[in-house]
Regions:
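Extended acidic/charged loop-beta regions that coordinate divalent cations
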Residues: 60
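A short, sequence-level motif marking secondary-structure junctions
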Residues: 22-28
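Charged interaction scaffolds used for protein-protein
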Residues: 1-12, 17, 32, 37-50, ...
Length: 108
């Protein structure tokens, strides 16, 4: 079960619940993946609903790696993610929000 105050969420991948966190290392890897793009631009795309499936996948990979699973992007391409693309997008948005909100601003 997730603790919204910890900044962590979980995702069911291939029927296994996986913890996710945007640790400093995971954020650094995400920045490399984004290339010329920025974390600020990624957050803005999620806030406005203008994110892409690539944004969701990059965020999911970073979160899973930050949660301790050494998964690759290519491994997730064929994985069964609970809720499908919409479920993945919802969890990615929760992860992003929890990573950047102060504890007193977080909502369950």
């Amino acid at each position: 079960m997730d603790n919204p105050w910890s900044g962590r969420v979980s995702l069911l991948v291939n029927d296994v619940e996986r913890p996710m966190a945007l640790t400093l290392g995971a954020l650094a890897e995400l920045e490399v993946t984004l290339g010329d793009d920025t974390l600020v631009a990624l957050v803005e795309r999620f806030e406005t609903g203008a994110f892409s499936s690539g944004d969701v996948l990059s965020l999911i990979v970073a979160g899973l790696r930050g949660g301790g699973w050494s998964v690759t992007r290519s491994e997730l391409l064929s994985a069964d993610i609970a809720g499908g693309p919409m479920g993945a997008a919802r969890v990615a948005a929760q992860l992003l929000a929890r990573a950047f909100l102060l504890p007193e601003e977080r909502r369950a």
